[in-house]
Amino acid sequence: MINFLNMKYFLVVAEARSFSAAAKQLYISQQTLSAHIAQIEEEIGTQLFERTRPLTLTPAGERFHRGATEMLFLNAQMERELQDIVDPMRNSFRLGISHAYARALL
């Protein structure tokens, strides 16, 4: 099963167009990153990148890029909405002013 971490890693590689540059950005080894991408490719049964310099997306990679971008966006949105349900005051804005100034405004 493809997980969100692998999708995130894929998107960073696609943006960087390099496994080594993406690995540096993610603070992981290039071997670890390659293993995550290989896991996705094995699971879906096709390559996502043309291993040229710079890396380019295959047609399947382009489709996966669109889907992964959308899924990660929806996941982040859902997490924010759920957090707002759990803690509605989390994103509230508080303004502090002195009593004298508040009276003058009212």
Please state what every model-predicted region is.
Residues N3-N6, Q30, G61, A68:
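The N-cap/first-turn positions of alpha helices
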Residues K8, A35:
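Base-recognition residues in the alpha-helical recognition helix of bacterial helix-turn-helix
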